[in-house]
Amino acid sequence: MAAGASLKRIKEASPTPETNHELGFIKKVVFKLHDTYANSTRTIEEPPFEVTETGWGEFEISIRIFFPTEMGEKNILLYHHLKLHPYKKDNIPAQIGAPGGAPNANEDEENTNVPQPVDSYVYDELVFNEPSEQMFELLTSRPGALLPAKSDPNDPSKSYSLQTEAEELDRLTAGLETVYQQVQKTKEYILQLEKEKETLSQ
């Protein structure tokens, strides 16, 4: 998903002949956009199953994937939360922003005047727990998708890599450690209050 300054677009990454071939087992995809769009339900019946639209904001898109009848596979419904706007600096917590928690006003004003693209990528994965025999043969007849070692900022299709996976794990680990430290401090504070309560009750 990508957004520009004057034109906001809802669009999947650019397809290739290889990806078109890999999506050939899909019969059609039905996108349900926000009700404010004319013809908010869009049915796409050929690869690369894209929807391109203009707009600005944040909303949920329902995506229903249909397979050919001979595949014997039920259709799949998934939801994609579209975020197509930048997060302003005043929404950033003080400890993450400029020193003292006050963002630089001149810098904020300067950034407002410079058009900046908004890139929003979300990784979705379909899991077939009990696929039909035809679907199983199709899925196992081709190699799985392997993540590249590093991300390429100029190629949206390579936004996910072993590098970004490791970075995300590091962020999760750091977040868990922060939560653990806060829980410990809270426990110590509660224990201190209980001791003070006992002292006052004597």
Curated annotation (Swiss-Prot):
UniProt keyword annotations, A-Z: Activator, Chromatin regulator, Coiled coil, Cytoplasm, DNA damage, DNA repair, Nucleus, Transcription, Transcription regulation
Positions of disulphide bridges: none
Locations listed in the record: Cytoplasm; Nucleus
One GO biological process term: chromatin remodeling
Coiled coil: 161-202
GO cellular component terms given for this protein: cytoplasm; NuA4 histone acetyltransferase complex; nucleus; Swr1 complex
Region span, Disordered: 94-113
Keyword Endoplasmic reticulum annotated: no
GO molecular-function term, one example from the UniProt record: histone binding
Ranges for domain YEATS: 1-142
Subunit text: Component of the SWR1 chromatin-remodeling complex and of the NuA4 histone acetyltransferase complex.
Function: Component of the SWR1 complex which mediates the ATP-dependent exchange of histone H2A for the H2A variant HZT1 leading to transcriptional regulation of selected genes by chromatin remodeling. Component of the NuA4 histone acetyltransferase complex which is involved in transcriptional activation of selected genes principally by acetylation of nucleosomal histones H4 and H2A. The NuA4 complex is also involved in DNA repair. Yaf9 may also be required for viability in conditions in which the structural integrity of the spindle is compromised.
Domain statement: The coiled-coil domain is required for assembly into the NuA4 complex.
Family that this chain belongs to: Belongs to the YAF9 family.
Protein name: Protein AF-9 homolog
Native organism: Yarrowia lipolytica (strain CLIB 122 / E 150)
Gene responsible for this protein: YAF9
